[in-house]
């Protein structure tokens, strides 16, 4: 609204998607049907998810199609918006959950039966029954509303301690309304209490298909140490519920927003006497992380798995008996320590030899920095890995740059003798450092110091991407990518176009 200088979230996802899907199926005559982009519903009614209609190849020409494809999808979305609507590629809407002025169009009061939120109305949740059911079931399984506390950025005018005056401390509509006053809302923090604060965030995800399971496992493992680094390099979400935060990333916000663990599982209530700590087959157990968090184990190198892994022992044993290797069996058994969050009655009794729905029900609600994706039943899709940590950027050029950089890194991993492996515990440390304010300049990250040794050192992000000065054993990610490009046959124009994307990544980490 230019006249009143306000910006709100449009809740017209359903209408816009209907128009887009009709357009993509009937109006794009110049694009083959199997190559037309697709648009999908997401958690928030103010969100659109888009994917290319067809996977890209690995040639230089295919890489240079990434940005035009993103531009096409944005153009299509804009075509079906109203005159006062704009498709914004931002991680989190800065005023989501504020009380002083409406933040959605149309405006709604927060009193929803699914979330019980003090700040967010259920009307911003996708209408499909899956999404409000997810919201309610996380709250019910947990035994309370989710508890999100983001450190507040402090300046000379910030009161000490800061007690948020915008929290409706005296609301008495739902039983959980008193949680904020009873300790759920921390002082000097931005308090949020609903799944929508996390699943209302947007990100940039890239999926790779490998020629075989062994290559997929190698790519998965080599990408794991890079997930915190790319999170820091793409950091783009410093504002929550109208307050400037002391973090720059969404990750811990989403992690807390879907944390369905009970008090006992979170370690906030005692285990029963004699109860094993990591036994998913018992009713009470400890779970170290939310189901939205960083990867917990490698698939190819046990020595880097230095953190105890909670597993569903029956699943692990069944997989081992069926010939699945030990590390992959442990990975899958770890996914199955979680309960399903939504099951539709018509899908309870399925033939698992023909349907993967039961597996995907668990797999798709384990939201980690990487996802290892077995081939679906039927068709020609192979083993895939999904890189999930990056934050969405404002422009198509920026998003294309990080996608292309990641694709080129995947080629480095598969064609050059590199090894980024390091203890998973240090990857977890890096994930927390990556989210701190101005992590590019203020933090140092654990990273392997040489491909000839398993030792790690702490480096700045610039050191890791450009190479450590005076250390020829740690060449840096960007020099490795350029070395790979040097081996390819391409025109000078193509190389210059690729270099523009890599230059953006290089400048971002400086």
List each language-model region with its residue ranges.
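Phosphate/nucleotide-binding catalytic core
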Residues: 1-510
């Amino acid at each position: 609204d230019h006249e009143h200088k306000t910006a709100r979230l449009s809740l017209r996802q359903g209408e816009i998607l209907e128009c887009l899907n009709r357009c993509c199926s009937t109006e794009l005559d110049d694009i083959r049907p199997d190559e037309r982009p697709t648009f999908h519903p997401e958690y928030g009614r103010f969100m659109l998810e888009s994917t290319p209609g067809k996977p890209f190849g690995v040639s230089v020409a295919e890489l240079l199609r990434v940005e035009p494809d993103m531009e096409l999808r944005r153009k299509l979305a804009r075509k079906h918006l109203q005159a006062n609507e704009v498709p914004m590629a931002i991680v989190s809407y800065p005023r989501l959950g504020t009380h002083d002025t409406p933040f959605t169009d149309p405006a709604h009061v927060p009193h929803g039966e699914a979330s019980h939120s003090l700040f967010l109305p259920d009307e911003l949740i996708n209408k499909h029954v899956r999404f409000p059911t997810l919201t309610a079931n996380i709250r019910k399984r947990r035994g309370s509303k989710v508890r999100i506390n983001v450190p507040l950025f402090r300046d000379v005018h910030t009161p000490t301690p800061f007690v948020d005056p915008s929290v409706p401390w005296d609301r008495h509509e739902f039983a959980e309304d008193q949680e904020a006053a009873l300790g759920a809302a921390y002082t000097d923090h931005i308090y949020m209490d609903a799944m929508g604060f996390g699943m209302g965030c947007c990100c940039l995800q890239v999926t790779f298909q490998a020629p075989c399971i062994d290559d997929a496992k190698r790519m998965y493992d080599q990408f794991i140490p890079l997930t915190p680094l790319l999170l820091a390099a793409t950091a783009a979400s410093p504002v929550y519920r109208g307050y400037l935060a002391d973090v720059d990333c969404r990750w811990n916000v989403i992690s807390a927003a879907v944390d369905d663990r009970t008090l006992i599982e979170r370690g906030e209530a005692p285990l029963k006497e004699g109860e094993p700590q990591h036994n998913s087959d018992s009713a009470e157990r400890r779970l170290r992380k939310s189901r939205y968090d960083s990867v917990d184990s490698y698939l190819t190198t046990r020595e880097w798995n230095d953190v105890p892994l909670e597993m569903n022992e029956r699943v692990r044993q069944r997989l081992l008996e069926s010939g699945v290797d030990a590390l992959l069996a442990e990975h899958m058994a770890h996914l199955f320590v979680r309960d399903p969050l939504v099951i539709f009655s018509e899908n309870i009794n399925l033939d698992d030899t023909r349907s993967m729905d039961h597996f995907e029900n668990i797999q798709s609600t384990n939201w980690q920095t990487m996802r290892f994706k077995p081939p679906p039943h039927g068709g020609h899709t192979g083993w895939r890995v999904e890189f999930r940590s990056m934050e969405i950027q404002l422009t198509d050029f920026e998003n294309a740059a990080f996608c292309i950089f990641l694709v080129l890194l995947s080629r480095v991993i598969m064609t050059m003798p590199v090894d980024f492996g390091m203890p998973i515990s240090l990857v977890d440390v890096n994930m927390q450092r990556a989210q701190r304010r101005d992590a590019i300049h203020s933090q140092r990250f654990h990273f392997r110091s040489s491909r000839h040794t398993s030792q790690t050192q702490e480096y700045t992000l610039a050191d890791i991407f450009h190479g450590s000065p005076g250390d020829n054993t740690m060449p840096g990610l960007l020099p490795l990518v350029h070395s790979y490009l040097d081996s390819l046959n391409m025109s000078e124009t193509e190389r210059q176009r690729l270099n523009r994307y890599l230059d953006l990544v290089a400048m971002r980490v400086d």
